[in-house]
Amino acid sequence: MRLDAASVATTAIDFARQFVDAPLDKQKGGADHTTTTEAGQDTPFATGPGDGNAVHPNDVRQNGYGSCAVLSSLVSIAQQDPGAIRDMIQDNGDGTYTVTFQEPIEIFGMQLGTREVEVTVSGPFEGGAAHPSGDVSAGGQQEVWPAIIEAAYAQQYHAHDPQYSTGVNPADVMERVLGVSAQSEDVGSVDFGTIERQLENGDAVVAWTSSTTDANGNSVFATPEQQAIADSYGVVPGHAYGVREVVRAGETYVDPNTGQEVTAAEDMIVLENPWGSNDAAMTFADYQAVYYQLNSAPTSP
């Protein structure tokens, strides 16, 4: 019997749907990734002063190597849906943590669902891309949820380059954390109102600065004009920032670096640096001049 293309596609999709809800085998590991610590030295979650929630964007403090895409995605997800992060980490009580990612299932370009992938990592986490948040539990334990997820992501999806020297796409991170489809768009094609609606709807949103490489192999902005704009805000090239808010002209916002309330003279965007410092409040026009890609994903179906 000869099947036409539509019949083949339908048969393949029906076959794949059998496995959408079937979890993958648990991916255990971490023995050669980190060293097991005594139970109780770290804790996934702790509520720090002014947090309001044990999972907070200010918990993320990137260290020196290139996991900004992972950590900026976590910044934005923590802002919009802290429960999604809490639900993905299980403390095994022995110094190890099991992180559950949502692996998209696609066939012929159609996403049919997700499978759970469990990845177990062990501490201590002092040397990873994410420092402990600085928040401490009543028992004196350091909060380390960003480092736990970063280590698990590296182990599962970036084992060939655990220090992320080749970078990661924030859209991939969002999909694997949230189990939904993420979007990647040119900054120039996403206007102020669209970002405003995305944030109001609870979407996680991350913006990348543009970059090129100079003769010495350093990441730089492509033009002197871009470099001058970026320098005026302390923004660096080839770096991912979580989008905290957009502010219309005439509205007030809190400057992320001074803590002072400011009235916007023109449309503004506030971006959170996963370093844990050097956030940026930029005019929307300047943001469009030095950023090149916007990644977003809904945090709820």
Show which residues each predicted segment covers.
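Accessory/interaction modules and long regulatory regions
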Residues: 2-301
